[in-house]
Swiss-Prot record:
Sequence intervals crossing the membrane: 1-21, 29-49, 58-78
Record's subcellular location: Mitochondrion inner membrane
Protein topology in the membrane: Multi-pass membrane protein
Catalytic activity, EC: 7.1.1.2
Subunit structure: Core subunit of respiratory chain NADH dehydrogenase (Complex I) which is composed of 45 different subunits.
Protein name: NADH-ubiquinone oxidoreductase chain 4L
InterPro entries linked: NADH_UbQ_OxRdtase_chain4L/K, NUOK/Mnh_C1-like
Family: Belongs to the complex I subunit 4L family.
Length: 98
């Protein structure tokens, strides 16, 4: 296995561990989630470049679109929680129910 793939998998694993360890604050959870999506995007792009498949070119772009949507929804939720409660704790998420 080439060294670049091992580095990307290590970045994904570190982001996953950060997501599990720092899950009390929403901002740190969003940053770890973005790190995971970035490493998955780079891995999908490298796999697409190595396979030389024209049909697989849409996969990294689709992942990038979903990552942007996830970031927008996460930041909107962060602003809503911060304006309402003044804190960004994840345990406040269940208080936003109608």
């Amino acid at each position: 296995m080439p060294l670049i793939y091992m580095n990307i998998m290590l970045a994904f694993t570190i982001s996953l561990l950060g997501m599990l360890v720092y899950r009390s604050h929403l901002m740190s959870s969003l940053l770890c989630l973005e790190g995971m999506m970035l490493s998955l995007f780079i891995m999908a792009t490298l796999m697409t470049l190595n396979t030389h498949s024209l049909l697989a070119n849409i996969v990294p772009i689709t992942m990038l679109v979903f990552a942007a949507c996830e970031a927008a929804v996460g930041l909107a939720l962060l602003v809503s929680i911060s304006n309402t409660y003044g804190l960004d704790y994840v345990h406040n998420l269940n208080l936003l129910q109608c």
